[in-house]
Design a protein with these regions (language model features):
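Positively charged n-region of N-terminal signal peptides that target proteins for export
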Residues: 1-4
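Outer membrane beta-barrel
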Residues: 22-40, 50-168, 177-179, 186-195, ...
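Hydrophobic helical h-region of N-terminal Sec-dependent signal peptides
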Residues: 6-10
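Outer-membrane beta-barrel pore domains
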Residues: 25, 34, 39-50, 85-90, ...
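Conserved adenosyl
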Residues: 172
Length: 336
């Protein structure tokens, strides 16, 4: 794995965006890398308390292609550290591999594709390098082998739809071994504001079906972004997921912005200890905030000092788990 580590980052460090184009076909390629210098001040996991080091949360190489005005495709591979603080190990996988075609005001895409759970929200939020969205952290998948259809409902483009089927087949970044049916509608009354309504259904064997309802409302201007996200996932006999999040950015100078995500878990996260980089105690409800100051050092480098702090309610035994507190310096190189 060490050889893979050095090879990947040698490629990324020397990478610059490239493109080849003619009248009928074009291809472009780029990459990005983000990670943290971190110090764990407190943790509900005693072995990680007072640990420190560097973690590579994502290194990505991407190739995009277009043929004519309608066909498009993407191939993307990624490398990332997995494990726990002071015990990380770099691994890699394919993240995207798909082909699509525009059909007037609609588009169909098939392959290993991003789910439609987060695409609109992340486009407006645009801070995934700092922290994943709350439902993504707690188990709603972001990739699936499947097919999606997106398009406009109204002629003025203020109402649009997205439909997707995710198959039970798994490959690379898709780890969900169940069929999934997804739909969403976006209302955009102005260029700056939007409302998204989202649902999905995931049949599973026995009494373990999953169904999700999600609402997002946001507003984005040149000066700030603010958004509210609520997700409820019923898991029948399994513990449910219910989470609310507040997202925000505020530009304070031409090269500095305040950024934050706060979220509250209405129910404990059963697999919280397995969440890489930000583990949660699985026995208690929790409030988490990730907040920092983002400094832009040119078009391709962001430096963001930030804190990630989780506070717990009392669990069913009447015990409040130890807080989780990380101090981080997040670095983001973007060559895409």
């Amino acid at each position: 794995m060490t050889r893979f580590y050095y090879l990947f980052f040698l490629m990324l460090s020397t990478f610059s965006p490239i493109s080849i184009a003619d009248e009928r076909f074009s291809i472009s390629a780029g990459g990005m890398l983000f990670g943290d210098l971190y110090y764990v001040s407190k943790s509900h996991l005693p072995d990680t308390t007072e640990s420190a080091g560097w973690v590579t949360r994502r290194g990505v190489l991407t190739a995009n292609a277009k043929a004519g005005e309608n066909w498009f495709a993407r191939a993307r591979v990624e490398a990332f550290d997995e494990g726990n603080a002071e015990d990380y190990d770099l691994t890699g996988q394919g993240r995207d591999l798909y082909i699509g075609r525009k059909l007037g005001q609609h588009a169909i895409t098939g392959g290993l594709i991003p789910t439609i759970s987060y695409d609109v929200i992340e486009h407006h939020w645009n801070k995934r390098y700092l922290v994943r969205l709350a439902p993504d952290l707690h188990g709603v998948p972001s990739r699936d082998l499947g097919i999606s259809l997106k398009g406009k409902i109204s002629n003025d483009a203020r109402v649009s739809y997205r439909l997707m089927y995710g198959s039970s087949a798994t490959w690379e970044a898709d780890h969900n071994a169940y069929d999934k049916f997804i739909g969403a509608v976006v209302f955009q009354p102005t260029e700056e504001s939007l409302l998204e309504l989202y649902v999905d259904e995931e049949p599973r064997p026995g009494n373990h079906d999953r169904s999700t309802a999600q609402v997002f409302a946001g507003r984005k201007t040149e000066q700030y972004f603010m958004g509210v996200l609520y997700t409820h996932q019923d898991r029948q006999s399994d513990p449910p997921l219910e989470v609310a999040a507040l997202l925000g950015t505020l530009k304070v100078t031409s090269s500095a912005s305040l950024v934050s995500q706060f979220h509250y878990l209405f129910e404990p996260s059963p697999k919280g200890n397995s969440i890489t980089y930000l583990p949660f105690d699985p026995s208690a409800r929790a409030s988490n905030i990730v907040a920092g100051i983002e400094f832009s050092l040119g078009r391709q480098l962001l430096i963001t000092p930030n804190v990630a702090w989780t506070v717990y309610d009392q669990n069913s035994q009447g015990v409040r788990p130890e807080d989780d507190l990380q101090v981080r310096l997040t670095v983001f190189f973007n060559f895409e």
